[in-house]
């Protein structure tokens, strides 16, 4: 029985040209600034972490650490509740 290697093309080569790429780790911007807390009234900073459809960017895309991602989520939800940020855009 032939074994199927899921990461190889039909001709036996790797799809990315045989190069192994390591992704550069993103650094939490809030840790770099050494900010104590994330303010829900700072709309310009919060908008960087919300998509144009109104969804909160995940940690793997935003590059935040777990602690600041949780604080950011709470701040965005608070800003939405008092109508500083929209829930969705149409």
Swiss-Prot record:
Region (Disordered): 1-23
Pfam families membership: Ribosomal_S18 (PF01084)
SUPFAM superfamilies: Ribosomal protein S18
GO biological process annotation, one example: translation
Keywords attached to this entry: Ribonucleoprotein, Ribosomal protein, RNA-binding, rRNA-binding
Basic and acidic residues bias: start-end ranges: 1-14
Single annotated GO MF: small ribosomal subunit rRNA binding
One Gene Ontology term, aspect cellular component: cytosolic small ribosomal subunit
Annotated signal sequence range: none
Origin superkingdom: Bacteria
Keyword Zinc-finger in record: no
Quaternary structure and interacting proteins, as annotated: Part of the 30S ribosomal subunit. Forms a tight heterodimer with protein bS6.
Known function: Binds as a heterodimer with protein bS6 to the central domain of the 16S rRNA, where it helps stabilize the platform of the 30S subunit.
The family this protein is said to belong to: Belongs to the bacterial ribosomal protein bS18 family.
Name of the protein in its database record: Small ribosomal subunit protein bS18
Source organism: Clostridium acetobutylicum (strain ATCC 824 / DSM 792 / JCM 1419 / IAM 19013 / LMG 5710 / NBRC 13948 / NRRL B-527 / VKM B-1787 / 2291 / W)
Classification lineage: Bacteria, Bacillati, Bacillota, Clostridia, Eubacteriales
């Amino acid at each position: 029985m032939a074994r199927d290697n899921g990461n190889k093309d039909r001709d036996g080569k790797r799809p990315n040209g045989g190069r192994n790429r390591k992704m550069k780790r993103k650094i939490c911007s809030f840790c770099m600034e050494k900010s104590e807390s994330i303010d829900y009234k700072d709309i310009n900073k919060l908008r960087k972490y919300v998509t144009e459809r109104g969804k909160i960017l995940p940690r793997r895309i935003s590059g935040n650490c777990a602690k600041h991602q949780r604080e950011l989520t709470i701040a965005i939800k608070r800003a939405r509740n008092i109508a500083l940020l929209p829930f969705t855009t149409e």
